[in-house]
Amino acid sequence: MQLNPAEISELIKSRIEGLTVSADIRNQGTVVSVTDGIVRIHGLSDVMQGEMLEFPATADGTPTYGLALNLERDSVGSVILGEYEHIAEGDTVKCTGRILEVPVGPELLGRVVNALGQPIDGKGPINAKMTDVIEKVAPGVIARKSVDQPLQTGLKSIDSMVPVGRGQRELIIGDRQTGKTAVAIDAIINQKGKGVSCVYVAIGQKASSIKNVVRSLEQAGAMEYTIVVAASASESAAMQYVSAYSGCTMGEYFRDRGEDALIVYDDLSKQAVAYRQVSLLLRRPPGREAYPGDVFYLHSRLLERAARVNEKYVEDFTKGAVKGKTGSLTALPIIETQAGDVSAFVPTNVISITDGQIFLETSLFNAGIRPAINAGISVSRVGGAAQTKLIKNLSGGIRTDLAQYRELAAFAQFASDLDEATRKQLDRGARVTELLKQAQYSPLSISNMAATLFAVNKGFMDDVEVKKVLAFEHGLHAWLKDKNAALMAKLEANKAMDKDAEAELNTAVAAFKKAFA
């Protein structure tokens, strides 16, 4: 068969016209070395700081990504997110042109996810409609609104003495095994029915501990409004470092849409250790306690994202869909100290960044005072303005009573005969200390807390035996619920007490005391 040259040229022309060539210009590099999850790459001249890099997939086809953290003259230092055993020298690495993003939105509520937002609870995929970058600039001064709404934790000692407001950063600090996680979990449980979405970020904890936390939240019915981000101790340092920022982005979704959210970082000491590990492997120069120079910035850029934003910010962000609403993200970071040393590098950093701290002490915990809050050095720098009026008016004397009690108790150890006034103060202090004890997973409503504080302030407990104080309190709450339900509902709704309510409460407590005796 002979082909006419004209036919051949026509055929070639038609083929060329029908050919679609998609030019995909992507920056590529070559793996030079792989050690402990850190990959050094030659090439990638256009890579951005914090950009996601695409590595060869695993044997089962799972994509492998890394973060570009060190940008040097002739190489790039990257940290792998996930498994890295299959990566070898000479492998090709591609830039993605994207910063690391995680899924966000209400679809994540009730789920347990890893640092990349992938589900790890065995309940199937998460069909989130949106993703967002994990690193964001915190809202500016103009976009913020002052903290003036309370975030009730349901714990008497916190809500009365170190109140937390919506949009505040309140540090929970203490040695290991002092009940830091318990305080944070109680705060999450107490948000039930209050329209606050919660995020619990577990960093570097045992998988069994995370499982126990999830079980506790499920039993309390709190998982339905909570996202758990878990980067357990068995995961890479990179995942532990990234997890806090992922959780923060998930919380910001609610803040930016005029809703309230609470985020717990448990704990930032382990995140700092993970970041130190990554930095040392990247051969960055070590500083104090071998932490890199930017460890302060590590935590400040994270915690500054917790804020209360004004109506204009929310309206601009939602393009007018949400009007007249403020949004807030409240942070409860946790720091673990070594033998009560709050002057170590990371604890001092986080204390200076946050708006106050709740200090938990081993000696109080071992003495059975739980939550083991040291009222003397625990402060809330902005929470006072946000405290519920009802609790604020009733709790004024509590802190003073405790401070005087601690001072006198130390003095009374050496004095044999005490005058009547001193003995009275010691007795009152012992009762207040006993009263501030609270069982785990049993947060109190505002009305019940008010009734307790009212009873102790008015001296109704002065002649009750110290060991019977908590029984008196439980009995009082049951009595008021049964006999004075309308009054309690009024206190809960108004969050304030007028003269009539005060007189009615006084009569009710007096009647209960007669029956209790």
Curated annotation (Swiss-Prot):
Record-annotated site: Required for activity: S378
Top-rank taxon: Bacteria
Keywords of this entry: ATP synthesis, ATP-binding, Cell inner membrane, Cell membrane, CF(1), Hydrogen ion transport, Ion transport, Membrane, Nucleotide-binding, Translocase, Transport
Name used for this protein in its record: ATP synthase subunit alpha
Purpose of the protein: Produces ATP from ADP in the presence of a proton gradient across the membrane. The alpha chain is a regulatory subunit.
Uppermost EC category: translocase
Catalytic activity: ATP + H2O + 4 H(+)(in) = ADP + phosphate + 5 H(+)(out)
Family, similarity comment: Belongs to the ATPase alpha/beta chains family.
Quaternary assembly: F-type ATPases have 2 components, CF(1) - the catalytic core - and CF(0) - the membrane proton channel. CF(1) has five subunits: alpha(3), beta(3), gamma(1), delta(1), epsilon(1). CF(0) has three main subunits: a(1), b(2) and c(9-12). The alpha and beta chains form an alternating ring which encloses part of the gamma chain. CF(1) is attached to CF(0) by a central stalk formed by the gamma and epsilon chains, while a peripheral stalk is formed by the delta and b chains.
InterPro entries per UniProt: ATP_synth_asu-like_sf, ATP_synth_asu_C, ATP_synth_asu_C_sf, ATP_synth_F1_a_nt-bd_dom, ATP_synth_F1_asu, ATPase_a/bsu_AS, ATPase_F1/V1/A1_a/bsu_N, ATPase_F1/V1/A1_a/bsu_N_sf
Annotated residues for binding of ATP: G174, D175, R176, Q177, T178, G179, K180, T181
GO cellular component, one term: proton-transporting ATP synthase complex
Organism: Polaromonas sp. (strain JS666 / ATCC BAA-500)
Cellular location(s): Cell inner membrane
